[in-house]
Design a protein with these regions (language model features):
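Lectin-like carbohydrate-binding module/patch detector with strong preference for beta-trefoil
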Residues: 30-219
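Secretory targeting and sorting signals
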Residues: 1-32
Length: 219
């Protein structure tokens, strides 16, 4: 069956609209996905309690044995000091810098303030619902597994196991054969300029979003 010129023009216009729509959908899907997180990257970790539980941050010299700095959250990243809210992701199993970080990996989180300190569990916490206190130390393995964290993504896009910026993650401490508890905010912090205290908890989310952390680029 032969089409008239008018029909051929209509078909061509429809095809163009469909192509443009498909292109727009593809671009939108790509834009929605975060950037793949790789080892050696510097990130911010935003707690999700109340939608914004503050950014994981070092704040002042710690009085805990073996610790260097206190750890809590801060309302505005790096507002208290240079790079106090910036954390470098380092493999605890020997994966090379530039390798993709995958859900279930074991990592070190190295704070970039000063000469760099490792996120660490240190001593039993007395706070209600908490397991261990959290601080930063100059030694990456102060105790067996105290400085290692299992990173678990809640989900991602695409669902290929990789961790990306804007993903929500849970961080399980490796102390006691991965029994050190999940990184958690718990009550107001005592340090000047801080928002919430940071401890570990038995639960992924002890409260609404207290154990959930959004991965964000540091710049």
């Amino acid at each position: 069956m032969f089409r008239t010129v008018k029909q051929r023009l209509a078909v061509g216009a429809t095809a163009a609209v469909l192509a443009a729509t498909a292109g727009s959908f593809t671009a939108s899907a790509a834009d929605a996905a975060g950037t793949d997180l790789t080892y050696g990257s510097n990130i911010l970790l935003q707690n999700q309690y109340g939608g914004n539980g503050g950014y994981l941050d070092t704040n002042g010299v710690s009085s805990q044995a073996g610790a260097t700095y206190n750890v809590n959250t801060n309302q505005t990243p790096n507002s208290r000091g240079p790079a106090t809210s910036v954390w470098k992701v380092v493999s605890a199993t020997g994966k090379a810098a530039g390798t993709h970080v995958t859900s279930g990996d074991v990592i070190y989180l190295v704070n970039q303030y000063g000469s760099g300190t490792y996120l660490d569990t240190n001593g039993v916490s007395t706070k209600s619902g908490a397991k261990y206190m959290v601080s930063a130390t100059s030694t990456k393995d102060r105790g067996p597994g105290t400085g290692k964290w299992h990173i678990f993504g809640k989900t991602s896009s695409p669902t290929d196991g990789r961790i990306r910026t804007d993903d929500i993650v849970h961080l399980l401490n490796d102390y006691g054969s991965a029994n050190g508890g999940f990184l958690d905010t718990n009550g107001g912090a005592n340090q000047s300029g801080a928002k919430y205290d940071v401890v570990t908890s038995h639960y992924t989310d002890r409260g609404a979003g207290t154990g959930s952390w959004k991965v964000l680029p540091s710049n």
